[in-house]
Amino acid sequence: MPVARAIGLLLIGVMAGLGLDLCAKAILETYPLEQFVFLRSLIGLSIFLSLARQFGGLAALATRKWGWHLLRTLLAAGAMFGFFYGMARMPLIDALTLGFTAPLMMTALSVPMLGEHVGWRRWLAVVAGFGGVLMILRPGSGAITFAAVAVLFAAFCYACLAITARRLAPTESTYCLSIYVIAGPMAVSGVLSAGATWQVPDTAGWILFMLAGICSVVAWIGLVGAYRQASPSILAPFEYTALIGGAIAGYLIWDEVPDRWVVAGALVIIGSGLFVVYREVGGASSIRYLRTITASGSASLARRFGKTRSELDG
């Protein structure tokens, strides 16, 4: 039953991540982006810090790699601002689908940034995946908007976060990497909103802000638990249930209906992403895979697998 339990935890994590996106889209209809990023990050960070004892206390945040963490905080801010800016201005399913190009970008970036070898099959999958992006954006159709570019920029930032996590994984704990990429967007949004007049949330607004912060933590915990109990090659396909949930929610809440090009492009991106996962991690260590992806800054990508915390964070 461990696999069934892992799939259940994964689905909880995925749905919580989708809940975060739904809260964000609703919040951004009324409140400024920088206010949302700040309060969402503040609430999420407060919850994470309350769990510090489970990860070795605040001593787990000690680091000598401040330059790397500064870079990662900027990348995390770019990822969060880019994704939520775009999602607020385009159909939910379109934004989620474009966001799933991050694993393809990570594969491509691993060659120049890490010197890794990527075989022709994975390169073909990457090219096919970006062909799916072109199907969604349809150059010349007017679908290439600044919002779409912002989401792709966010996916690029997520990919860079994953690459830098690979560089830092031998010396930095997963908890440390996660905390700093939550604190980064909060700091950047605080600077950007300095002197601005924030809208005081009403009761419904505070509920949405709290739900957004809680959903981000539940997503992280659910995915962490899932990848402790089953391999990425088994669980990865279930992450794409976010697209099904996003399509249903977009239709029911905002009357958004994806056209045939978005559906076709999504299928190509999903197929390419799954192929890359199976080729890259099918026979690799789940610990290595998890330590790489966890610190990408996206709760929906947070993964860890191992027998003991010391094995993971040592």
Language-model region placement:
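C-terminal-most transmembrane helix of multi-pass membrane proteins
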Residues: 244-314
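Hydrophobic transmembrane alpha-helices of multi-pass small-molecule transport proteins
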Residues: 121-137, 154, 261-280
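Loop-to-transmembrane-helix transition segments
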Residues: 5-12, 52-53, 58-82, 146-154, ...
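Transmembrane alpha-helical segments that form core, pore/gating elements
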Residues: 22-25, 33, 48, 140-201, ...
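Helix-helix packing/entry segments at the starts of transmembrane helices
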Residues: 96-101, 168-183, 220-251
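Transmembrane alpha-helices of multi-pass small-molecule transport proteins
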Residues: 30-78, 157-160, 180-196
